[in-house]
Amino acid sequence: MEFKLNIPNTIIKTLQTIVFFLFVLLAFQIAEAEIHHHTFKIKSKAYTRLCNTNKILTVNGEFPGPTLKAYRGDKLIVNVINNANYNITLHWHGARQIRNPWSDGPEYVTQCPIRPGESYVYRIDLKVEEGTIWWHAHSQWARATVHGAFIVYPKRGSSYPFPKPHREIPLILGEWWKKENIMHIPGKANKTGGEPAISDSYTINGQPGYLYPCSKPETFKITVVRGRRYLLRIINAVMDEELFFAIANHTLTVVAKDGFYLKHFKSDYLMITPGQSMDVLLHANQRPNHYFVAARAYSSAFGAGFDKTTTTAILQYKGDTLNRIKPILPYLPPYNRTEASTRFTNQFRSQRPVNVPVKINTRLLYAISVNLMNCSDDRPCTGPFGKRFSSSINNISFVNPSVDILRAYYRHIGGVFQEDFPRNPPTKFNYTGENLPFPTRFGTKVVVLDYNSSVELILQGTTVWASNIHPIHLHGYNFYVVGSGFGNFDRRKDPLRYNLVDPPEETTVGVPRNGWTAVRFVANNPGVWLLHCHIERHATWGMNTVFIVKDGPTKSSRMVKPPPDLPSC
């Protein structure tokens, strides 16, 4: 029996018209995407801060470096030419680099460094990114001065999910060492086993600000008009400290973090960790005057040294006639006020309900620790008890190989890494107690994930050796922060409190020193991806590990081939 479906010609023509217009719209969207070409020349340049001139690494002689701007859907091609005396790589922090780990940047993980006199072309395809992200060096300590903002506007024809601001202002929070050669800091610390040299100031857009010597005239100024709204794109590029941030007499509205929109909330201050970015609306609703924009450290570590200074910029109202009077300072929580930090971060919620992985087939628990190691010779080190500092994830202190892991994985080079990174702490113990019951081991170990695995990763902070919040960053992915708490993670009770409806989507999350954070993601981006603490001394000491995500079954789910100009090892 033959069945015929009789559809009126008018409906067929209507459907054909709809399909045609959808095709035209798709073609238009593809055509309007742009390719942006940039040249980044790495070179040393002398800068004067704090009454002293020091040579630093820069991109194109700028500190901070150039701001990259593009629209969602665009592509960037960045030719990096190394004219400096140090090896260099660059990382595009917050860009997923889908199927293209060759352009992700961490040295000896996805590439060998660009040597002096050589070059390498990075390719960034902004398929899903939107908002404020950033770029920075990912070799040695070069990111202290080699960094910049990366602004990804909504797709052309789209708009922000908040009132359009009158103006947008990137604010990069950084650090400055008065006399130290930044590139030599980790080597000096490694020789002694102690902590790296502490910075002499924090900076806002490269300037220490009003409260430091020889700095007042160059203090960064933000000019505003009363009644208008401004979008502040704030990036914490500081090497080693979380920061409290505030503007005197002004309430801030937080609208996004790490390039993902949030349910808007108001706060008199921010707490932002190294590696994080935040989009904040400022309503210039105060009487014309000039007000301090200020940031200083939040440090929950007991007994650890840190820069205790305060950096400032000035919010200047147009028409202010009181500019000879010292600006008003904002209230910032005390440096060790953990409840202030927790109160702020607990307000993060995705703007809308999100598709959180529910059926988990890969469960990982990573204990992250600062450790002490015995010195290798007869001389005592300068760490506590004459030992040297180290750090670890699941008791493994990561060691950079001599050939990058991605190349070794792709080309089947043996002896570079091992696939036996522990998926849980090798020995269970009281993670938030006062000591570690076993010594740390060194290794270059990875976890291999099947393509499309649904992963739950518990990041368990520890209390030992003056640890503070660990800002953990995962390359190649964003994840949902479904839960967080203090104490040891309880697998029976704590998941009952997860937020599986509208958890924030992030790329860098702060893990409490004596608590835990739970994140979930789908391993659908094949490649080799670094997971590490964004406190630079912790990463230098070994608080890193690597995920290898296998290729999927189709061409569109497999890694792209390596580029011809990949730096040699």
UniProtKB/Swiss-Prot annotation:
The organism's place on the tree of life at top rank: Eukaryota
Positions with a binding annotation for Cu cation 2: 93, 136, 534
Signal sequence coordinates: 1-33
Intracellular or extracellular location(s): Secreted, Extracellular space, Apoplast
Cofactor detail note: Binds 4 Cu cations per monomer.
Domain Plastocyanin-like stretches: 41-157, 167-320, 420-553
Protein's UniProt keywords contain Signal: yes
Tissue: Expressed at low levels in flowers and siliques.
Residue positions with a glycan: 87, 190, 249, 336, 374, 395, 430, 452
Binding site residues for Cu cation 3: 138, 475, 532
Keyword Iron-sulfur: no
Function: Lignin degradation and detoxification of lignin-derived products.
Family: Belongs to the multicopper oxidase family.
Protein name: Laccase-14
Name of encoding gene: LAC14
